[in-house]
């Protein structure tokens, strides 16, 4: 990996997001793809974990204020629709994030800079980095800029996604909450296959696969719903 001009990278991110990073090492971590991971170099996966939670929390608060008459189920479905992968990817593409992600030459040649999973992960990592670098005002400004209009135009309640439907199903029957476990990740970096197992106490487990961990969880939830609703 060639040395990275951190100041130039920070300027490009400022132009794309409106946020000026102070900790350039944190920014570098947020934009580093796992294909460049070494023992001495961090990638965006930990910050992605944080950013996913920050995005969900901020959008939840946004919806709570925008729709005072919605019940929990409606708010949950709206939040799921707003933070799903396709929405995050669309926003990542709109700010040109793909070209700023640091990855191996082979990964870029295989289309890694426009890979939906990579774009989703990197944008969530960037939001996590904003949180760590500048606190609430840093990430809220960015999230509101890109998600508020989308939320305001949600005049309907989206249909339930499988994970939400499964959760509400088991809660309504007093069952233990579903547990999701990543079983494996296979395939090349530019086209990974994730396998996730969902289990419900006394009702066994079901395996789902997908091109991202989130999609695999949704597939597993869908299959589990089918299994338990067919019980006598």
Curated annotation (Swiss-Prot):
Subcellular location: Cytoplasm
Keyword Magnesium: yes
Superkingdom to which the source organism belongs: Bacteria
CDD domains: DSRM_RNAse_III_family (cd10845), RIBOc (cd00593)
Span of domain DRBM: 161-230
GO molecular function, one term: ribonuclease III activity
Keywords: Cytoplasm, Endonuclease, Hydrolase, Magnesium, Metal-binding, mRNA processing, Nuclease, RNA-binding, rRNA processing, rRNA-binding, tRNA processing
Cofactor(s) needed: Mg(2+)
Positions annotated as active site in the UniProt record: 52, 124
Sites where the protein binds Mg(2+): 48, 121, 124
EC number(s) on file: 3.1.26.3
Domain spans labelled RNase III: 10-135
InterPro entries: dsRBD_dom, RNase_III, RNase_III_dom, RNase_III_sf
Chief localisation class: cytoplasm
GO BP field: mRNA processing; regulation of gene expression; rRNA processing; tRNA processing
Catalytic activity: Endonucleolytic cleavage to 5'-phosphomonoester
GO cellular component: cytoplasm
Family recorded in the similarity comment: Belongs to the ribonuclease III family.
Subunit details: Homodimer.
Function as written in the Swiss-Prot or TrEMBL entry: Digests double-stranded RNA. Involved in the processing of primary rRNA transcript to yield the immediate precursors to the large and small rRNAs (23S and 16S). Processes some mRNAs, and tRNAs when they are encoded in the rRNA operon. Processes pre-crRNA and tracrRNA of type II CRISPR loci if present in the organism.
Entry-linked NCBIfam families: RNaseIII (TIGR02191)
Record protein name field: Ribonuclease 3
Species of the source: Anaplasma marginale (strain Florida)
């Amino acid at each position: 990996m060639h040395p990275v001009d951190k100041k130039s990278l920070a300027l490009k991110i400022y132009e794309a997001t409106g946020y000026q990073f102070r900790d350039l090492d944190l920014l570098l971590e947020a934009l580093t793809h796992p294909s460049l991971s070494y023992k001495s170099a961090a990638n965006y996966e930990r910050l992605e974990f944080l950013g996913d939670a920050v995005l969900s929390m901020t959008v939840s608060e946004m919806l709570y204020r925008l729709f005072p008459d919605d019940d929990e189920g409606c708010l949950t479905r709206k939040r799921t629709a707003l933070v799903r992968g396709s929405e995050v990817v669309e926003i990542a593409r709109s700010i040109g994030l793909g070209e700023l992600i640091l990855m191996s030459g082979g990964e870029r040649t295989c289309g890694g800079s426009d890979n939906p999973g990579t774009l989703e992960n990197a944008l969530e990592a960037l939001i996590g980095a904003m949180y760590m670098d500048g606190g609430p005002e840093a990430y809220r400004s960015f999230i509101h800029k890109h998600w508020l209009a989308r939320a305001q135009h949600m005049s309907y309640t989206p249909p339930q996604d499988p994970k939400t439907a499964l959760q509400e199903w088991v809660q309504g029957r007093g069952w233990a909450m579903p547990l999701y476990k990543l079983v494996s990740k296979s395939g090349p970096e530019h086209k990974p296959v994730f396998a996730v197992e969902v289990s419900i106490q006394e009702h066994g487990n079901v395996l789902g696969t997908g091109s991202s961990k989130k999609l695999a969880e949704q597939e597993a939830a869908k299959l589990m719903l089918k299994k338990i609703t067919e019980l006598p």
